[in-house]
Design a protein with these regions (language model features):
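Iron-sulfur-associated redox domains of electron-transfer enzymes in respiratory
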Residues: 62-373
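Iron-sulfur cluster-binding cysteine motifs and their immediate structural context
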Residues: 2-10, 14-40, 45, 49-65, ...
Length: 373
């Protein structure tokens, strides 16, 4: 049986109720005759808010470091796909080329950046929005947003974008390049990726996903530091504006050339409370909203719960933009355009499953019985 994505170490829990107060979907409660919080895997959407709000570190997430170590030890060719958020996470490493070499030293034979897959995803969104025929969409780049819809707004599943997240698209590209049996590990700031990949199969499914927190643990375990490695660049294909993906608005740089608030057909919404409110408005009054929604439960992927460092949003955004400028300034556009044409046609159907977890309101009889207790 799969370990729950988030769970409580009961001996550490002090019942401070911080997790219960902050859970956006009320997936945490205290069971009768217990003295600790309990997370319902069925109701949980994997946002990680409880993990970051627990003052005593009683809440943990499913670790996959041993799984990745096993993949690396048992296979000669293992591909690492790095989320573009590395630009704001690994600022303690002097040069990204050192970071790439550290991954190779860990045992990865190929090291790719997901920015190119984001470029592909952005082009798909651009086509989706330009072919607009009166139907509005919710982007599906954030797996926690997808689970929020699947579990608490299942009527909106048809409005979820038919385009999967960059992790899935990047995996499909890697399998196209290296073959269907290639081992793929996704490295990023999102804990929910660990559950997201379980929805997919075949060439669309990564073999594992680890967070930046776990990657740092692997570096420490093998005593890998930048001082021990030489420079090494990412393997091709290289991305363009996909490097801006860690910022919530980043993907719109490519898929929505219209920057005007008056005419742009897409509205970006980030953070759990605003996302919940936006989805409710989308569901109840879409004719007033007249917008597609670009949704992220965090303040951009650069602020994901799987990040190990505590840089604030503004510094992370600055690091991301600076990195993107450097990468774009040296991009071979002729090669990039050829690779976009080569891989843009890969079929990557999104997978969604309705899983209604809404609690029914008690009837008058039940309320009366409760009040009598």
């Amino acid at each position: 049986m799969e370990t729950p994505l988030f769970y409580v170490e009961t001996d550490k829990c002090t019942l401070c109720f911080a997790c219960i107060r902050n859970c956006p979907v009320k997936a945490i409660d205290v069971k009768e005759l217990t003295e600790w919080a309990d997370i319902s895997p069925d109701r949980c959407i994997g946002c990680g808010i409880c993990y970051h709000n627990c003052p005593v570190n009683a809440i943990q997430f499913r670790q996959t470091t041993e799984e990745v170590s096993s993949i690396l030890s048992e296979n000669k060719d293992v591909i690492a796909i790095c989320d573009p958020s590395i630009s704001s996470e690994f600022t303690d490493i002097a040069d990204y080329k050192k970071f790439v070499s550290m991954l190779r030293m860990l045992g990865f034979s190929k090291v790719h950046e997901a920015a190119f897959a984001v470029d592909i995803v952005a082009l798909q969104y651009k086509k989706l929005f330009s072919d607009f025929k009166g139907k509005y969409y919710l982007t599906a780049n954030c797996p926690s947003v997808v689970e929020l819809v699947e579990k608490y707004h299942p009527e909106l599943i048809d409005n979820l974008s038919p385009i999967p997240s960059p992790m899935i698209v990047a995996t499909a590209i890697m399998r196209k390049i290296y073959g269907d049996t290639a081992k793929v590990v996704y490295i990023g700031p999102c804990i929910a990726n660990k559950n997201e990949l379980l929805k997919y199969s075949g060439t669309l499914r990564p073999d594992s996903a680890i967070t930046f927190i776990e990657l740092r643990q692997l570096f420490e375990k093998d005593q890998i530091t930048e001082g021990k490695v030489e420079y090494s660049d990412f393997d091709s294909p290289i991305g363009e504006k996909g490097a801006l993906y860690p910022i919530s608005e980043g993907i719109l740089e490519s898929c929505s050339p219209d920057k005007s608030l008056l005419t742009r057909p897409i509205q970006t919404v980030e953070s759990s409370s605003d996302v919940k409110e936006a989805i409710k408005t989308f569901e109840e009054d879409i004719e007033m909203l007249h917008k597609h929604l670009n949704l992220f439960m965090c303040q951009g992927c650069m602020m994901g719960p799987g990040c190990a460092t505590s840089n604030n949003k503004h510094s992370r955004s600055a690091y991301t933009i600076d990195y993107a400028k450097k990468r774009i300034s040296i991009l071979n556009y002729t090669k990039w355009e050829a690779e976009i044409e080569k891989y843009a046609g890969i079929e990557t159907p999104a997978v969604y499953h309705a899983n209604d977890q809404r609690r029914k309101l008690p009837g008058k009889k039940q309320i009366a019985e409760i009040l009598e207790i």
